[in-house]
Swiss-Prot record:
UniProt family annotation: Belongs to the YejK family.
InterPro entries from the UniProt entry: Nucleoid_associated_NdpA (IPR007358)
Protein name in the entry: Nucleoid-associated protein Pfl01_0983
Domain of life: Bacteria
Compartments in which it is found: Cytoplasm, Nucleoid
Pfam families: NA37
Length: 334
């Protein structure tokens, strides 16, 4: 993963309304193994983060100037340090307007994966820990907590530059339960949601369930294809990449690689050729689980409609083919 440019600035601010103080770095960070490891860990943590949203830039304006600065940098009008400085000054201003915001180290990293350029921006905080010295003494130790990302975004610069119709070249971490504490960061990037990741994933899973039903597949085959879909989606999510419907279709049925893709198009589910995988929705699709009043139920989703029947009006489940271990326990209950 070649790192083209990387820099860190510090915004010192507490959530008490006091002015934010910017400590800007004057030059890029030199290439080092530490920088490479930090960015690799950051990407791994970011890709694993649930609840991300995907979108695109607002039209450039005084309220949303970031895309204009990025364009100027990519076209050679600004060097990376100058670009990051004007951007972090804008972030400082937005932080001061948001009483809930706290400061931190602001990372800007321009890197490549394959032939694709990315820009990652993250607000990082320290954690207190301990370390053991060469003299075997235990000493306090501070480190960047890359595992707890709350404000971060990643821009697929190549997609932004080359595909004017794309609505998902930016991904960003959304605040939990609509918390406004993260809104200033989204405004800083100047992005708007363009793709409903959970909604698109639910539609894809509905299309897949319809496909399996229309094909009248045996249970083993349905289970295998379900695993293929979930494994592919999870793999793409781990890489931070969207799911390609044509590629997924080829994996689901190698003998008829276009079958699932044609099903999606013919039934007009309204899915984009590439959609972001929402991990929370995928996990719900893999299994149904529930617990209440001493009862715990968990079963694989593909069993619904075959071994397990759900009566919504009566609020009941009918389970066929109980596990032998369970029936043996029931027989011995007296």
């Amino acid at each position: 993963m070649p790192i083209r440019h990387c820099i860190v600035h510090l915004i010192d601010k507490k959530p008490d309304g006091t002015p934010a103080v910017l400590h800007a770095r004057d030059s890029e960070l030199a290439e080092s193994a530490a920088i490479e490891n930090m960015l690799a860990d950051l990407n791994e943590s970011y890709n694993a983060k649930q609840g991300k949203a995907w979108g695109l830039f607002h039209p450039e304006s005084g309220a949303f100037p970031f895309s204009g600065w990025l364009k100027e940098y990519m076209e050679g009008g600004k060097d990376f340090t100058a670009f990051s400085k004007v951007a972090v000054e804008h972030l400082q201003k937005l932080m001061e307007e948001s009483n809930l915001s706290v400061g931190g180290h602001v990372l800007f990293a321009h890197y490549q994966q394959g032939m694709t350029d990315y820009l990652a921006i993250a607000l990082l905080h320290h954690s207190e820990g301990v370390a053991v010295t060469d003299q075997l003494d235990v000493t306090p130790s501070r480190h960047l907590d890359l595992g707890q990302l709350h404000l971060a975004a990643r821009i697929n610069v190549s997609e932004w530059q080359n595909n004017k119709q794309s609505k998902q070249y930016i991904s960003f971490i959304k605040g939990k339960n609509g918390k406004k504490v993260s809104e200033y960061f989204r405004d800083f990037i100047g992005c708007q949601e363009g793709v409903d990741g959970p909604g698109e994933t639910r539609t894809l899973l509905k299309a897949f369930s319809d496909f399996v039903e229309s094909e009248d597949l045996p249970e083993d085959s349905a289970r295998e294809k379900t695993k293929t879909l979930v494994d592919y989606a999870s793999s793409q999510a781990k890489l931070g990449e969207p799911m390609g419907l044509e590629e997924l279709s080829e994996l689901i049925d190698e003998e008829r690689p276009k079958a699932f893709y044609d099903h999606i198009r013919n039934k007009d589910y309204g899915l984009s050729p590439e959609i972001p995988a929402d991990k929370r929705t995928l996990n719900q699709f893999r299994r149904f689980t529930g617990r209440a009043e001493g009862l715990s139920i968990s079963f694989e989703a593909h069993l619904l409609g075959s071994k397990i029947e759900y009566d919504e009006e009566a609020g009941t489940l009918v389970i066929k083919g109980l596990p032998t271990s369970l029936t043996d326990q029931l027989k011995r209950r007296n």
